[in-house]
C-alpha cells in the first residue's frame, strides 16, 4: 500500500484510460507532473538516465528513444546521458525525416534536430600518441604476463598517472618500476612492440578499435603457429592489417594479394617505397594510379619495408578478409596441404 501511495498507482491507471480514449496530450502533461512528484518524493538530488550504445539500434528505434527523451528533457531534477556515434544518429534522423538540405544551409537539419535535444554535447577525444602507446603496451602486458605481475604493473601505472597525465608509460618505465628481485620475462611483450608505431600512425586512436585490432592480430599469430609458419613477423602482419582495417582503402589489401599471388608471394615494389617518400611521389606505372594518396604513400613508406618479403603465408592467415573468387585451397601452401593430407590419412586409418 505504501508503494502504491508513493507511485500514485491509481493516478497512473487513470492515465492509461486517457490513452485508450485517444487523449494523448492530456496523458503526456499529467504523466510529466506525476513523474516530477515521484522524483521529489524519492528524495534524490537528481535522477540520471544513461542510454548507452544507442547507435546500435535500428533507425526507427533510435528515433523512438529520442522522442521519448524529448518528453522528459525539461522535467526537474532529471538528466539524460546518451552515448552514441553522432554520425549514426544523424543518419537515423535523415531516414525518419527526409528533408532536403538547401545549398545555403550552413548546418544540416539533422544536426539542428540534435542541437535542440542535446543541451551539453561532449565528444570523446581520440587517444593521443602517448596514450595509445601506453594503452597498447599495457594490453600486451595483460595478454602475455600472469595476473599477479600485470596487476602490480597496472598499480604502478596508476601511481604514475596521478603525477603525470601527459607522458607515455612505455616498456622502459614499466621495467624501471619493477623491483630488482623480481625476474619478469618481457620477451613476448617486447617481441610485439615493433607493431606499436604502425598502430599509432594508421588507426584512429579509438580504444575499442585498438583492442579489437590486437585481438585479431593475436588470432592470426595463433593461426600461423598452428600452421607451422615460423617466419611471420608481427610488424609485417600489422602493416598489412592496418591497410585491411581502413574502410576507404581495404580494396588495396585485395590488390596486394593479387600482386603477390602473381609474383610468387613477393610484391613487385622496385623503388616504389622510396618514391613514396619523395615530393614527386610514385612514378612506377603499376602503382602510380591507385597508390598516390597521402595515406597510401605514408603506408608504403612506413617501416617495415615489404620489399623482397614473401607474403604468401601472411595472406593465408588473413584469408578471412579476402573477397576473391578463388577457393581457399589455392591459398594454402604446399607444406600445409601436405600436413592436411597426412592428418586425413591418419583419420582414415584409425
Sequence positions of predicted segments:
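The feature marks long, low-complexity, polar/acidic/proline-rich intrinsically disordered regions embedded
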Residues: 1-11, 17, 21, 33, ...
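Flexible phosphate/Mg2+-sensing switch loops adjacent to catalytic phosphate-binding sites
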Residues: 84, 92-111, 226-233
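Conserved P-loop NTPase catalytic core
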Residues: 101-138, 142
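Conserved Walker B catalytic segment
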Residues: 22-27, 33-87, 91, 96-98
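Short hinge/gating elements
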Residues: 16-17, 121
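Residue-level signature of catalytic and energy-coupling elements of molecular machines
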Residues: 52, 122, 206
Amino acid at each position: 500500500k505504501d508503494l502504491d501511495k508513493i507511485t500514485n498507482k491509481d493516478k497512473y491507471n487513470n492515465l492509461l484510460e486517457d490513452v485508450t480514449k485517444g487523449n494523448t496530450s492530456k496523458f503526456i502533461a499529467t504523466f510529466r507532473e506525476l513523474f516530477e512528484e515521484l522524483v521529489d518524493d524519492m528524495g534524490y538530488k537528481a535522477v540520471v538516465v544513461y542510454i548507452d550504445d544507442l547507435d546500435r539500434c535500428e533507425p526507427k528505434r533510435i528515433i523512438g528513444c529520442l522522442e521519448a527523451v524529448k518528453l522528459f528533457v525539461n522535467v526537474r531534477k532529471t538528466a539524460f546521458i546518451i552515448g552514441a556515434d553522432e554520425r549514426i544518429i544523424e543518419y537515423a534522423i535523415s531516414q525518419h525525416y527526409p528533408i532536403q538540405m538547401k545549398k545555403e544551409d550552413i548546418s544540416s537539419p539533422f544536426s539542428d534536430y540534435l542541437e535542440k535535444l542535446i543541451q551539453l554535447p561532449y565528444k570523446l577525444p581520440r587517444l593521443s600518441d602517448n596514450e595509445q602507446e601506453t594503452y597498447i603496451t599495457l594490453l600486451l602486458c595483460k595478454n602475455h604476463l600472469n595476473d599477479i605481475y600485470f596487476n602490480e604493473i597496472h598499480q604502478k601505472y596508476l601511481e604514475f598517472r596521478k603525477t603525470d597525465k601527459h607522458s607515455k608509460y612505455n616498456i622502459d618505465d614499466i621495467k624501471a618500476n619493477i623491483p630488482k628481485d623480481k625476474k619478469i620475462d618481457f620477451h613476448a611483450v617486447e617481441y610485439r612492440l615493433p607493431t606499436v608505431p604502425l598502430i599509432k600512425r594508421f588507426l584512429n586512436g579509438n580504444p575499442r578499435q585498438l583492442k579489437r585490432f590486437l585481438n585479431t592480430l593475436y588470432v592470426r599469430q595463433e593461426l600461423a603457429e598452428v600452421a607451422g609458419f615460423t617466419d611471420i613477423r608481427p610488424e609485417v602482419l600489422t602493416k598489412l592489417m592496418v591497410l585491411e582495417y581502413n574502410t576507404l582503402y581495404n580494396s588495396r589489401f585485395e590488390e596486394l594479394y593479387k600482386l603477390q599471388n602473381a609474383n610468387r608471394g613477393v610484391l613487385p615494389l622496385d623503388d616504389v617505397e622510396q618514391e613514396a617518400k619523395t615530393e614527386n611521389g610514385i612514378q612506377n606505372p603499376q602503382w602510380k594510379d591507385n597508390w598516390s594518396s597521402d595515406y597510401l604513400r605514408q603506408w608504403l613508406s612506413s617501416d617495415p619495408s615489404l620489399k623482397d618479403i614473401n607474403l604468401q603465408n601472411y595472406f593465408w592467415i588473413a584469408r578471412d578478409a579476402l573477397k576473391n573468387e578463388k577457393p581457399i585451397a589455392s591459398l594454402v601452401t604446399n607444406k600445409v596441404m601436405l600436413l592436411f593430407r597426412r592428418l586425413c590419412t591418419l583419420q582414415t586409418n584409425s
